[in-house]
């Protein structure tokens, strides 16, 4: 499998570029550069920050123009106020003011004709484990944490079987981590 890494700042990469990868330095806020990076590919995986609403519009447009249909887009928990209880209140207090662009990004993607999977991950840990469960868009979010390795495993599963989780919007968390706040040790 060949891959193209489209990054704003290659200095932030903490790994050696794999032999099957090419690096393109660019910005998802630049539609032309984004199109050039996307054309000819089968799947787009996006894990962004900042103006994610504008970036999502640009990605959808570039994918449409390039004829690429499969998108995996990492978003944030809480965009639908789907996080229940004290943890939901805590989460809203911590990141609620940042969530509007993430919600707009999800809305843009869901309104498109793309074959998308949106992943709303719980608070991320660096635990060396793959242990996760999934909730659907309209279900209450479960748990408070999930390992980056778990989210990566789910993304890899979707890339390996692109027909899975088609046009799905999923919450991802570690089972049995419900609580009032995430334990991030």
Language model regions located:
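A conditional alpha-helix N-cap/helix-loop micro-motif detector
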Residues: 27, 52-53, 98
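Bulky hydrophobic/aromatic packing residues
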Residues: 23, 56-57, 132
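Glycine- and other small-residue-rich loops at beta-strand/loop junctions that grip anionic moieties
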Residues: 26, 48, 144
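Conserved Rossmann-fold cofactor-binding substructure of NAD(P)-dependent oxidoreductases
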Residues: 18-42
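NAD(P)-cofactor binding segment of oxidoreductase domains
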Residues: 43-74, 102-104
């Amino acid at each position: 499998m060949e891959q193209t890494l489209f990054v704003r700042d290659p200095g932030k990469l903490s790994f050696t570029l794999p032999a099957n990868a090419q690096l393109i330095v660019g910005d998802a806020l630049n539609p032309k550069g984004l199109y050039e990076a996307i054309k000819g590919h089968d799947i787009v995986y996006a894990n962004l920050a900042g103006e994610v609403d504008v970036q999502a519009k640009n990605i959808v447009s570039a994918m449409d123009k390039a004829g690429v249909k499969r998108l995996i887009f990492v978003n944030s928990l809480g965009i639908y106020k789907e996080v229940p209880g004290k943890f939901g209140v805590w989460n809203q207090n911590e990141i609620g003011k940042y969530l509007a662009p993430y919600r707009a990004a999800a809305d843009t993607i869901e309104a498109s004709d793309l074959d998308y999977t949106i992943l709303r991950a719980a608070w991320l840990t660096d635990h060396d484990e793959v242990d996760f469960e999934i909730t659907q868009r309209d279900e209450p979010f479960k748990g408070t944490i999930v390992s980056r390795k778990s989210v990566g495993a789910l993304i890899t599963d979707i890339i390996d079987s692109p027909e899975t989780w088609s046009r799905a919007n999923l919450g991802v968390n570690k089972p049995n981590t419900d609580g009032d706040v995430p334990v991030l040790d």
